Regions:
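Bacterial Sec-dependent N-terminal signal peptides
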Residues: 1-26
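Beta-propeller blade termini and top-face loops
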Residues: 23-393
Length: 393
């Protein structure tokens, strides 16, 4: 019985590693966009031939419920007329300041939306499908849709493998030009991500910025004074059902001086903006000053570890961060009182004495890092990890 308890930590650690490898091996492949559209068409056929097709149902509730609002676009001439897009609830229009809403996207292949763009001068709507957040509940879209009659009818414009669209921008004077920031697949790497440009109203697209298979474009803005100048942000992230890597080298800010044909990276080691593995999602906005200068603002989810403040330290305490990177040799040098205090502070059972732990580490039965993860889970790691967090530049 005593021997079983002694090996408990080692067994749990080994099982965790084995399960992690097994999950990687069993990660299912993504469903291609063509198959998803084929399934949607099959659903329509089944619905048309259903014996209850002509029976009309009325929703009697509950009605006081909603979801994430991803975009609102308001008429520049009538503030009571606007469109509202939902993460997984479609597109809606109101002409009476929200007293009532009309659904516009219920009959399309998907209900998930990442961004919308409206040309109020000619009643044209663009919808980029697939919420751009990266939660487990952020469902994929099927590309870009366009309506030239205020949402009555829709034309599918492609980019089916983009899955999650963060931004659609329309050229202020050329009705045929639009840009799309595509984040790409959430659970798998893919190539259809980055910045896309159309010069024929959405009939064809050119990929003008591509970073790598796990980094897509999440945001983009036009220079208020020059539509040939654009700024975009890329975001590297990787989601699994059991894990989320929300930052990486592929997260950066880019600039185009030729209408989005080519791009140059403007964030980096010497730019003053964060760089490296800890850079997460980046949001952008631009403004024009009174003297004609353009100011670019960037909000970044900085996952780099927060540096210790002046005078801030853990004193003589043994910390989890120290244990995670500690060698067996250095662990053997830890004073007994430090190890005892750590074990007591982190809720180790009394039978795990400093002498016993040192013996197990020296024999290779456990590693120093095992002690750091003894009572951790996803929630504790989230709130105990001291990262820089949100920054605005």
């Amino acid at each position: 019985m005593t021997m079983s308890i002694r090996y408990l930590l080692t067994a749990l650690l080994g099982l965790s590693c084995w399960l992690g490898n097994a999950q990687d091996l069993t990660q299912p492949p993504f469903t291609p966009a063509a198959e998803r559209m084929q399934a949607y068409e099959q659903r329509q056929q089944l619905q048309a031939s259903s014996i209850i097709n002509n029976i009309r149902f009325t929703n009697v509730g509950p009605t006081i419920m909603s979801g994430r609002v991803v975009d609102i676009d308001v008429s520049p001439n009538d503030p009571t007329h606007f469109y509202v897009a939902y993460a997984s609830g479609g597109l809606w229009r109101t002409t009476n300041n929200g007293t009532s809403f009309e659904p516009l996207f219920d009959n399309e292949a998907v209900m998930t939306i990442g961004d919308i763009a409206v040309d109020w001068s000619n009643n044209t709507l663009w919808v980029g499908t697939g919420e751009v957040n990266s939660s487990r509940s952020s469902y994929a879209g099927a590309g870009v849709y366009k309506s030239t009659d205020g949402g009555k009818n829709w034309t599918y414009c492609g980019l089916g493998e983009s899955h999650h669209i963060g931004r659609i921008l329309l050229h202020p004077t050329n009705k045929q030009v639009a840009w799309v920031a595509a984040l790409g697949h959430l659970y798998s790497p893919n190539a259809e991500r980055g910045i896309y440009k159309t010069s024929d109203g959405g009939k064809t697209w050119q990929q003008t910025l591509y970073v790598h298979p796990n980094a897509g474009a999440v945001d983009m803005v036009l220079d208020p004074g020059n539509p040939d100048v654009l700024y975009a942000s890329s975001w590297e992230r990787e989601r699994r059902a059991w894990n989320f890597v929300e930052s990486g080298e592929g997260s950066a800010i880019w600039k185009s001086m030729d209408g989005g044909k080519t791009w140059a990276k403007i964030s980096g080691a010497n730019s003053g903006f964060p760089a490296g593995e800890g850079v997460g999602r980046i949001g952008l906005d631009a403004a024009r000053t009174a003297n004609g200068r353009t100011v670019l603002y960037a909000a970044v989810d900085n996952n780099n570890r927060r540096p210790a403040k002046e005078g801030e330290s853990d004193g003589d305490k043994l910390t989890k961060d120290q244990l995670r990177s500690m060698s067996v040799e250095d662990f053997a040098k830890i004073p007994v009182y430090q190890l005892r205090d750590y074990l007591q502070a982190n809720g180790f059972p009394a039978r795990y004495t400093p002498a016993r732990i040192k013996e197990d580490v020296a024999a290779g039965r456990i590693k120093p890092a095992t002690l750091a993860g003894y009572n951790e889970d996803a929630n504790s790691q989230l709130f105990e990890t001291a990262i820089v967090g949100l920054e605005i530049y």
